[in-house]
């Protein structure tokens, strides 16, 4: 678009970083994620959902557990929305050092760290959902090293190879992001313990394997 901001001119201030984090949270409000398909579709596959005569067959293939193709628009929407979250996180993390090097106020530096911690946590959540939905279960380190994981990207504008990593590497990527989030969020004296509980609960889910 003609009014778009070039990458190298974006996120210049601490306020910009804070707004970028708000944008990440806003992306989670997608109708394909927790307020829509990501919550609805698994519920439709439970034993308590029944198809009735005269139904319109909306979500029919999901309910039947068959003929679920990669071109299913609901599933495409979930996949795209999760990577949209990841891209926003990568965008912020790629630009944050430019602001940090020009910031001298300690409170502002702490806020930058907090925002980065939230971005790492958001990226870990998005990748954890992708792994849960599109990968096989983690049986063992040896097996996971030979199973397909998800496409891992650390940068918004990079020359990273767009191919699926191993399941083992995908899990490790998520755990590394959670470790970074825990380290950075711990620096914020106002960070709520309930938020940290959510972080460690996510980490525990992956560490149990």
How should each PLM-predicted stretch be described?
Residues 39-72, 157, 202-209:
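A structural signal for short, hydrophobic/glycine-enriched beta-strand patches
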Residues 118, 125, 198, 204-206:
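Residue register of alpha-helical TPR repeats
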Residues 58-134, 165, 183-188, 192:
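Conserved, well-structured interaction surfaces
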Residues 1-45:
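Membrane-proximal, proline-rich intrinsically disordered regions
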Residues 114, 121, 147, 169, ...:
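Residue signature of alpha-solenoid helical repeat architecture, marking inter-repeat boundaries
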Residues 102-112, 133-173:
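Short coil/linker segments at helix-helix boundaries
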Residues 9-16, 70-85, 111, 144, ...:
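Extracytoplasmic/periplasmic, Sec-exported soluble proteins
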């Amino acid at each position: 678009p003609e009014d778009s901001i070039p990458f190298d001119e974006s996120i210049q201030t601490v306020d910009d970083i804070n707004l970028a984090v708000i944008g990440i949270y806003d992306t989670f409000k997608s109708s394909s994620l927790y307020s829509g398909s990501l919550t609805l579709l698994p519920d439709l596959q439970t034993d308590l959902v029944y198809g009735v005569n005269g139904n319109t067959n909306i979500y029919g293939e999901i309910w039947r557990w068959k003929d679920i193709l990669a071109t299913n628009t609901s599933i495409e929407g979930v996949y795209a929305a999760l990577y949209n979250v990841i891209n926003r996180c990568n965008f912020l993390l790629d630009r944050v050092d430019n602001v940090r090097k020009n910031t001298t106020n300690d409170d502002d530096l702490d806020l930058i760290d907090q925002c980065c911690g939230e971005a790492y946590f958001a990226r870990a959540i998005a990748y954890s959902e992708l792994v849960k939905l599109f990968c096989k279960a983690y049986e063992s380190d040896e097996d996971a090293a030979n199973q397909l994981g998800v496409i891992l990207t650390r940068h918004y504008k990079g020359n990273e190879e767009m191919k699926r990593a191993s399941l083992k590497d995908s899990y490790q990527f998520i755990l590394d992001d959670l470790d970074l989030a825990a380290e950075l969020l711990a620096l914020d004296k106002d960070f709520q313990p309930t938020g940290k509980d959510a972080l460690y609960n996510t980490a525990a889910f992956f560490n149990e394997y």
